């Protein structure tokens, strides 16, 4: 069962590998329940090097580790899952390389319904608000979150995009029970405290 609080670690320009790992570990200590490495512009070797270290952290805290976009590298690492965007390989193609869990980004109801047909293990729904993590992508808004809550049944899904402690209640009121965050934890002055606050709010609803 996938937990409610999912962190995507996108290494920041100027951060050392150790700084990235330190902030990841502090987030895990605060209660992050799923962690993903998203290093879109990195070549394979540095992605594997950081991925190995992050996977070890995830194992230490007992949470699943996902790699973004690269089922081949996910298989080499022994990752728990791979997360695919709309312009990445299809889940069927990814499973030729990789036997673990497969997640899928969706930005509209028709994409979500297709992801269900593709048999993904979970999907993300958003972006709820515009975010610099995905520049140029228009917000899908809370209406898409409400649609997901009404139509996706028992399939695990995560609201994503610009979510932080200040607007989390709106996302919960729209029906989400799982969220993906990047900046709200990764860029926080204290990632452990930020993760703990988000998790407490998430688990404060039924």
From Swiss-Prot:
Record EC number: 2.5.1.3
Cofactor binding summary note: Binds 1 Mg(2+) ion per subunit.
Entry's Gene Ontology cellular component terms: cytoplasm
Q: Which residues bind 2-[(2R,5Z)-2-carboxy-4-methylthiazol-5(2H)-ylidene]ethyl phosphate?
A: 131-133, 162
Transferase in keyword set: yes
For this protein, the record's Pfam families field holds: TMP-TENI (PF02581)
Q: Does the keyword Metal-binding apply?
A: yes
**Cofactor(s) needed by this chain:** Mg(2+)
Task: Kindly report, in one word, the top-level EC class recorded for this enzyme.
Answer: transferase
State one molecular function term (GO).
thiamine-phosphate diphosphorylase activity
Record keywords, A-Z: Magnesium, Metal-binding, Thiamine biosynthesis, Transferase
Q: Which domain of life is it from?
A: Bacteria
InterPro entries the record matches:
Aldolase_TIM, ThiamineP_synth_sf, ThiamineP_synth_TenI, TMP_synthase
At which positions is Mg(2+) bound? 69, 88
Pathway field of the UniProt record reads: Cofactor biosynthesis; thiamine diphosphate biosynthesis; thiamine phosphate from 4-amino-2-methyl-5-diphosphomethylpyrimidine and 4-methyl-5-(2-phosphoethyl)-thiazole: step 1/1
Q: For binding 4-amino-2-methyl-5-(diphosphooxymethyl)pyrimidine, which residues are annotated in this chain's numbering?
A: 36-40, 68, 105, 134
Record PANTHER family: THIAMINE-PHOSPHATE PYROPHOSPHORYLASE, THIAMINE-PHOSPHATE SYNTHASE
Which family does this protein fall into?
Belongs to the thiamine-phosphate synthase family.
Name-wise, this protein is Thiamine-phosphate synthase
Organism (species): Thermus thermophilus (strain ATCC 27634 / DSM 579 / HB8)
Q: What would be the name of the gene that encodes this protein? A: thiE
